């Protein structure tokens, strides 16, 4: 890839950044739609091409100012792309990559946005050939909402994006993917795929399970109780409104790491239970304080 360069002054000083000749986003939902919006808003790509499976979605996307063209097939969409971002659900990323590989330019770079990385990074690297490259990525910028209509150009601003090369990944390709996400506003962390999956099992996948489990439990109680819910319950369970099919697939793909995290969390719950049962409120307070101290060290909300 031979990107042009541009001067980026959005943070008050000049930095050199890559401008892609063509960015293609396959299967844009919330994240993919935000990638296209951010790329247009920040001048990251001269041309932005999208492909969606449904014809009516392609028609709607073609009307957006941040989309230059849509194609009827993913193969057509990637044919002239410098960078391809596959924004499909995690179980469809590698099959879609294998489908388009024969049409990739020799120097094309393919990435993804999947929230599970070990299997995708390994199989993705094995799938590409002919000079093209695959580098996994995962922006930590989701929402309980789904669909490209909910995308935002500023979705990645200040958010972490994991870039997950494997040992055989081309170093320049990995650097290009990291630069791409920085140009979209993200703070890039380069990490191996297995460590990524362990981390997100604890900080993303486990919270989803807990929010859903709490709502599922409350659904067995008096239905009228939900009418009295205050901010605490609403804040705690916001992500329980997330797409069921999407999360079933994520939990399936990261099953082993999520199970480990669940077992460890169960130990914490049992500690609270034992302290309450034994009327050991000093221990209860200590556990509450440990949780409060951890929460207070979060980065400021963006």
Task: Show where each model-derived region lies.
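NAD(P)+-binding Rossmann beta1-loop-alpha1 motif at the extreme N-terminus of oxidoreductases
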Residues: 16-79
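Rossmann-like NAD(P)-binding element
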Residues: 74-104, 108-109
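Glycine-rich, N-terminal phosphate-binding loop of Rossmann-like dinucleotide-binding domains
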Residues: 87-89, 114, 165
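Rossmann-like NAD(P)(H) cofactor-binding subdomain of soluble oxidoreductases
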Residues: 96-149
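Internal alpha-helical scaffold of NAD(P)-dependent oxidoreductase catalytic cores
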Residues: 154-238
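Interdomain hinge/lid region at the active-site interface
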Residues: 224-291
